[in-house]
From Swiss-Prot:
It holds the Pfam family Aminotran_1_2. It is an enzyme of class 2 (transferase). The modification N6-(pyridoxal phosphate)lysine is found at residue 222. It comes from Halorubrum lacusprofundi (strain ATCC 49239 / DSM 5036 / JCM 8891 / ACAM 34). Residues 17-33 have a biased composition (Basic and acidic residues). InterPro entries: Aminotrans_II_pyridoxalP_BS (IPR001917), Aminotransferase_I/II_large (IPR004839), HisP_aminotrans (IPR005861), HistidinolP_aminotransfase (IPR050106), PyrdxlP-dep_Trfase (IPR015424), PyrdxlP-dep_Trfase_major (IPR015421), PyrdxlP-dep_Trfase_small (IPR015422). It comes from the Archaea. It catalyses: L-histidinol phosphate + 2-oxoglutarate = 3-(imidazol-4-yl)-2-oxopropyl phosphate + L-glutamate. This is Histidinol-phosphate aminotransferase. Gene3D superfamilies: Aspartate Aminotransferase, domain 1, Type I PLP-dependent aspartate aminotransferase-like (Major domain). Transmembrane segments: none annotated. GO terms for biological process: L-histidine biosynthetic process.
Amino acid sequence: MQPRDLSDHSPYVPGRGVEEVARDRGLDPDDLIKLSSNENPHGPSPAAVDAIREHADRVHQYPKSSHTDLTAKLAEKWDVSTEQVWVSPGADGSIDYLSRAALEPGDEVLVPEPGFAYYAMSARYHHGEVSEYALSPDDGFAQDAETVLSAYGGERIVYLTSPHNPSGSVMPLDEVRAIADATAEETLVVVDEAYGEFAEVDSAIPLVDERDDVAVLRTFSKAYGLAGLRIGYSVVPEAWGEAYARVNTPFAANELACRAALAALDDEEHVAESVETARWAREYIADELDAPTVESAGNFVLAEVGDAERVAEEAQERGVIIRDCTSFGLPNHVRISTGTREGTREAVARLNETLADLGLGVRA
């Protein structure tokens, strides 16, 4: 017996981890600076760590009350009903829930190229088809309604990413509204705001209450520093509320993740520090790296270095882990996550040495 034909399904390619690189390179993990996965360099909120410790002896229980409490807290934060908040194992989980709720076999989704691979992966898992709209490095991967609508052909779901991964460009709220206005009544416009805390643009969540064709994805992985716990959520139109119970994987958002997220929501100081550091670091990288960069509103910077694979490999030899963006269809670009001030300065210095030695990436 064999699994079904999965030849159209491409595996997700994550950034490499510290331990993995240290083993491969024979390096001390403590000497490595990991800037490949857009993680929070400050780690989780101390309050979240305390909550994990406090509730660790309860993991034999299903996360019913913690899930309910987190849903209520998020609904209060965004001024929506609890039925509109779909808590999930990471924002990826919410993408799957929306696929389950929206897609019939053969339905299409429209996704950005380059972009986050899981939009297409989830659609194909759920027997959907995938179309793309192109974002170009020639204009800094600028996002607007015209770009999306020129590729739109009645797809069931249209994915927007603001800030966009891997470029960091944003989709202004007026452009989101224009896309929702121009698409068909049965098209759901999904705005992925995984990096929303780092941007200086308005969230699209208020649109969810204005209309029934917009949903928004959010996560605790980035600004809240809970990537390892896999906890996220979506805010959906009120009319979609009752679908959650029919598509949600039971108890998929685990007890410790829900408890940590509840505590992290109250630690506004930790989030503010994380955002401040990211904004400082992305400006530092843009100013000091010896390569052209794309203006970013995320906790990362996309740089054009000429040969992403060579630069990423050589950078690892110097103890800096960055993301080779060849898997995004950008073989000339690397993505550099924002680190601490000290880590960012040191990483940029080592990257500049790498670029100089390779004769690549010098600013035009």
